[in-house]
Swiss-Prot record:
This is Putative pre-16S rRNA nuclease. Gene3D superfamilies: YqgF/RNase H-like domain (3.30.420.140). Pfam families: RuvX (PF03652). It is found in: Cytoplasm. GO terms for biological process: rRNA 5'-end processing. Could be a nuclease involved in processing of the 5'-end of pre-16S rRNA. GO terms for molecular function: nuclease activity. It comes from Shigella dysenteriae serotype 1 (strain Sd197). Keywords: Cytoplasm, Hydrolase, Nuclease, Ribosome biogenesis. GO terms for cellular component: cytosol. Its main location: cytoplasm.
Amino acid sequence: MSGTLLAFDFGTKSIGVAVGQRITGTARPLPAIKAQDGTPDWNIIERLLKEWQPDEIIVGLPLNMDGTEQPLTARARKFANRIHGRFGVDVKLHDERLSTVEARSGLFEQGGYRALNKGKVDSASAVIILESYFEQGY
């Protein structure tokens, strides 16, 4: 086991991506993947898996603040199931509440409104999801 994990912040237009190391508990953003109504270019995901060879994949699970599911929750689950089905890699879902808010805040502090492009926000959210996963001791 390499200790490498990939995280995805699922969205219908853009899917944020991050790579992280279990040993350091840190993650960094990778370029976001464009999606057509939630469907990514599966060839890009396959290339990411070949390049990084993750032990597992973490997919952010969008929930309402009270923990109930929202319309995007089922689609994120479906995305996670498709990754597992296509590539046979372990996939776990992780609560992503407020990850986008935190990502926007951090990017804004770094570069103002110009830093808030959609792909950067989505991949920064994926970093937050993965680091949160590490912080919970996984």
